[in-house]
Amino acid sequence: FATCVKGKFGWDFVNSEKRITTPLIREGNEFVPASWEDAIHLVATKLREIQAKYGNDSLGFISSSKTTNEENYLMQKLARQVFETNNIDNCSRYCQAPASDGLTRTVGIGADSGTVEDIESAGLVIIVGASPADGHPVLASRIKRAQKTRGQKLIVSDLRKHEMAERSDLFIHPKQGTDFVWLTAVAKYMIDQGWHDEVFMENRISNVADYLAFLEPFTLEYAEKETGLSVET
């Protein structure tokens, strides 16, 4: 019988040895287990000390998209009413805003331009700096199924050799922070070879001439030098 994909593949973190199960307080160079009462008292005391010494706006609070609306509401109440600061943010904006901005500038909307079904039906999937098997088991299950049933090809670029890297047809390990370089070099190479859809680019993409000019420095030789990947790769 079928089970929920998240429940089937995304449960191991619950019993992970890396999971913190009790508050820890730093003593010297070590973290020592403490009670919740002691930990909360220490945090409250230190926050008040910082506030008294440096002012209200020396404090900042970051809430989480993994908590409920009510809990996020309480966090902003804590910041604004208890510590009298408007320095309150959410990890969703901090983490996802750059991606949303980039997508808006490139595809015209700050959201995914495709669907999980599109990825599953593709002939080739490229994963860059991510591990869907850990972070998005539903998507990973679709890729695994497409590999098994349709022979879908998978390329993974990462610093880590995780499960999806083990399953890949090609795993590349570029220097840290150079994914942009090799991806841009691949785009230039494809255009140089005439493998791009000229009609689509002409009708659906703005500033094509500027983009082509931007690609010029990104030769395969330049990418090899910057990323550590061979031209043959």
Label the predicted regions.
Residues 1-233:
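Catalytic alpha/large subunits of respiratory electron-transfer oxidoreductases
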